[in-house]
Amino acid sequence: MKPKRVQGKIVIEFPSEDIAEVVYTSVLYEHVSVPYRRSRVNFRREGRRIVLEIEANDSSAMRGTVNSYLRWIKVALDVLNI
């Protein structure tokens, strides 16, 4: 029996649209350039929010995808705070 795909949604709200835009733009390059074979991500900005909708083949792929995006977002925020 083939395992079901795993789905999840993450919404991160920032203090301002400007910060959300900078973080979104920073992470967008990674989103476009890194090929994922085991997951699909709908990555977008909605005002002050960044939205990730993830569909993965299994829980390991989901975990890896979530970890990558959250790490990229954290790095972008850390750079903003320098």
Curated annotation (Swiss-Prot):
Protein name: KEOPS complex subunit Pcc1
Subunit structure: Component of the KEOPS complex that consists of Kae1, Bud32, Cgi121 and Pcc1; the whole complex dimerizes.
InterPro entries for the chain: CTAG/Pcc1, KEOPS_CTAG/PCC1
Job description of the protein: Component of the KEOPS complex that is required for the formation of a threonylcarbamoyl group on adenosine at position 37 (t(6)A37) in tRNAs that read codons beginning with adenine. The complex is probably involved in the transfer of the threonylcarbamoyl moiety of threonylcarbamoyl-AMP (TC-AMP) to the N6 group of A37. Pcc1 functions as a dimerization module for the complex.
Similarity section: Belongs to the CTAG/PCC1 family.
Pfam families for the chain: Pcc1
GO cellular component, one term: cytoplasm
Gene that this sequence comes from: pcc1
UniProt record, GO biological process: tRNA threonylcarbamoyladenosine modification
Keywords: Cytoplasm, tRNA processing
Lineage: Archaea, Methanobacteriati, Methanobacteriota, Thermococci, Thermococcales
Subcellular location: Cytoplasm
Organism of provenance: Pyrococcus abyssi (strain GE5 / Orsay)
Top-level division of the source organism's lineage: Archaea
